[in-house]
Structures are given as structure tokens and as C-alpha cells.
């Protein structure tokens, strides 16, 4: 870790566009990328591969501290690559089974602490784009630029609906909207690291904005802070 390397945190709820914006910005600047939300899935997947029980806090803590993972920003319109121990696991960690495992390991305090340190280790020159829910409030509270990206629940459900339909999945817009509202409530009401903007975050509502318009606003903030 290089504590002097600049960090841009991009937090926000599911479907706000933060992952897309983070990936494009990292690619544009040539900075490192951290998808913090994927780390719990990666840990659950890695634990299963190594025969580690998902309730064994000590072994999970050790695995978390040494996760060999790299996030590669994708070209526009494509998904980012997630490389675990040299293998592309971008798709396999998105299964329901891995997701259930991720929820289990995320409930263990020692694992959360180990992953907190692992996330901070991504901070290297020339800089880091950190995408998540508590990047600006918990993981990188000293980041020189913090962005909190949101959009209406209806717009986020619509985006997710189009994404899943594009993959050929049979989904209901109303059920997706219900899921997003339920997740928003869980994220904002949880006792540990609730979803909320940092006091010094730039808040952007992307409901009526294109990805390029969001990027333009962030570029302006970067220039004002002499970060690029």
C-alpha cells in the first residue's frame, strides 16, 4: 500500500451506475480498480475451492488477508475482468450459491476486518478508483475525492431489468423494484457501515444523466483538486 497515492471513492446503492463509472474512470486514468462488493464473493468462492468451512472464522480471516485478486477495467460496454490466483472468475462468482456464501462470510467481524485491510492494500500509485458502499466513509476516509452516486429506485430497477433481459433472463420489473427497495433498506439501516454519503462527498443523482455526463462531472472535480 502507498498511503500517498490518490484515491477516488465511488459509493452508492445497487444499480446507480457506480461500477460502470468506476471501471471507465480507472481505464481512462490508468489507475488501479477496486470492486469491493466482489471481495466477499471472491472470499466465499476461494474458501470453497480450498475446502474451508464458511463458518471457520480464523481460516477465512487468513484467506481474506492473502486474497490474490486483480480487477481489470473493461472497455466501454464490456464487463470488468476479475482475476483470482491467475484465473478469470468474472462469471463464476456471480452465481446464487456464491452469493449465499458471501452473505455468510460478510457476517463475521474478523473477516470484515481482514478484508478492510486487504482493500486498503489496493492503494498504489498512480492512484486507485474504489467502488463500493462504504469506501468514502470507512475504507478510505482520507480520499481527496469522494463521489456518492445514486438514482431513483425506479430507474435502477429499469437498468437492471434491461441488463438481465439482454442476457436472455426472464425477469419482472416490479419484482426487481421490490428487491432494490428491500436492499436499500437493509443497506441504509444496518448497524455496521450503513450506506450513506460521506460528509465531504460530491453527491450525484444519475437518474436523468448519461454515464458520460457523470464522468464529465467527476473529471471537473478531479481538475479542481489537481488530481490529474
UniProtKB/Swiss-Prot annotation:
What keyword terms does UniProt attach to this protein? ATP-binding, Cytoplasm, Kinase, Nucleotide-binding, Transferase
**UniProt keyword annotation of Acyltransferase present:** no
Q: Name one GO biological process term.
A: nucleobase-containing small molecule interconversion
Per UniProt, subcellular location reads as: Cytoplasm
The molecular function terms of the Gene Ontology recorded here are: ATP binding; CMP kinase activity; dCMP kinase activity
Task: Give the CC-aspect GO terms.
Answer: cytosol
**Major place of residence:** cytoplasm
EC number(s) given by UniProt? 2.7.4.25
| Annotated InterPro entries | Cytidylate_kin, Cytidylate_kinase_dom, P-loop_NTPase
- The UniProt record gives the binding positions of ATP as 12-20
Q: Which reaction does it catalyse?
A: CMP + ATP = CDP + ADP; dCMP + ATP = dCDP + ADP
The UniProt entry, under NCBIfam families, shows: cmk
Family named by the database record? Belongs to the cytidylate kinase family. Type 1 subfamily.
What name goes with this protein?
Cytidylate kinase
- State the species of origin: Pseudomonas putida (strain W619)
Q: Which gene encodes it?
A: cmk
Amino acid at each position: 500500500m502507498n498511503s500517498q497515492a490518490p484515491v477516488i471513492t465511488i459509493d452508492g446503492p445497487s444499480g446507480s451506475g457506480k461500477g460502470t463509472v468506476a471501471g471507465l474512470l480507472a481505464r481512462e486514468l490508468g489507475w488501479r480498480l477496486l470492486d469491493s462488493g466482489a471481495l466477499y464473493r471472491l472470499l466465499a468462492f476461494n474458501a470453497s475451492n480450498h475446502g474451508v468451512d464458511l463458518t471457520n472464522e480464523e481460516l477465512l480471516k487468513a484467506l481474506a488477508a492473502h486474497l490474490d485478486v486483480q480487477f481489470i477495467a473493461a472497455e466501454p460496454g464490456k464487463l470488468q475482468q476479475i482475476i483470482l490466483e491467475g484465473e478469470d472468475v468474472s462469471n463464476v462468482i456471480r452465481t446464487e450459491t456464491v452469493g449465499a456464501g458471501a452473505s455468510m462470510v460478510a457476517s463475521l467481524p474478523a473477516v470484515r476486518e481482514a478484508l478492510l485491510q486487504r482493500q486498503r492494500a489496493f492503494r498504489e500509485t498512480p492512484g486507485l478508483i474504489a467502488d463500493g458502499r462504504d469506501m468514502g466513509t470507512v475504507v478510505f476516509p482520507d480520499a481527496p475525492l469522494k463521489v456518492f452516486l445514486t438514482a431513483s429506485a425506479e430507474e435502477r430497477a429499469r437498468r437492471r431489468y434491461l441488463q438481465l433481459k439482454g442476457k436472455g433472463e426472464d425477469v419482472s420489473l416490479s419484482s426487481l423494484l421490490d428487491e432494490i427497495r428491500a436492499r436499500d433498506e437493509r443497506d441504509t439501516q444496518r448497524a455496521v457501515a450503513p450506506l450513506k454519503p460521506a460528509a465531504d462527498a460530491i453527491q450525484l443523482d444519475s437518474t436523468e444523466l448519461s454515464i458520460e455526463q457523470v464522468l464529465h462531472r467527476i473529471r471537473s472535480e478531479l481538475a479542481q483538486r489537481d488530481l490529474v
